[in-house]
Swiss-Prot record:
Superkingdom to which the source organism belongs: Bacteria
Name under which the protein is recorded: DNA-directed RNA polymerase subunit omega
Function: Promotes RNA polymerase assembly. Latches the N- and C-terminal regions of the beta' subunit thereby facilitating its interaction with the beta and alpha subunits.
PANTHER family: DNA-DIRECTED RNA POLYMERASE SUBUNIT OMEGA
GO biological process, one term: DNA-templated transcription
HAMAP family linked to this entry: RNApol_bact_RpoZ
Origin organism lineage: Bacteria, Pseudomonadati, Pseudomonadota, Alphaproteobacteria, Hyphomicrobiales
């Protein structure tokens, strides 16, 4: 990579380690088919990503948010706050719920009991799954 390109980017992204993360993420996006915002000039994807950051055709903040979002396994969704009127109704609801529970008691659930020998016999009787080429 051209040193000039990296030095141009340091003005836009202060931390060089963060610059590497952002440029590598953008290079992966380009390799996956994301549109390029600068002329390619026969450069490879990491150089194109650095040039995009240096030319400020991409916001480093937006790129950072996109990187964080791509690394998250569980995305939290902001849910709207409940209005106070619904909170008053939910506070009164337990009193009504107790009365309704007394009237509509379902039968207790029962589970079959199994001895250890029966469990081991059942496990031994299992057929192993067919092998596949997935692993």
């Amino acid at each position: 990579m051209a040193r000039v390109t990296v030095e141009d980017c340091i003005d836009k992204v202060e931390n060089r380690f963060e610059l590497v993360l952002l440029a590598s993420h953008r290079a992966r996006l380009v390799s996956q088919g994301a549109p390029i915002t600068v002329d390619r000039d026969n450069d490879k994807n990491p150089v194109v990503a650095l040039r995009e950051i240096a030319d400020e055709t991409l916001s480093p903040g937006d790129l950072k948010e996109d990187l964080i979002h791509s690394l998250q396994k569980h995305v939290e969704v902001d849910e709207p706050e409940p209005d106070p009127a619904s909170l008053v109704q939910t506070e009164a609801a337990p009193a009504f719920a107790e009365a309704a529970e007394e009237e509509d008691q379902p039968e207790a659930l029962t589970f079959d009991r199994m001895s250890e020998e029966e469990l081991l016999a059942g496990i031994e009787g299992l057929v192993p799954p067919e092998k596949s080429d997935d692993y």
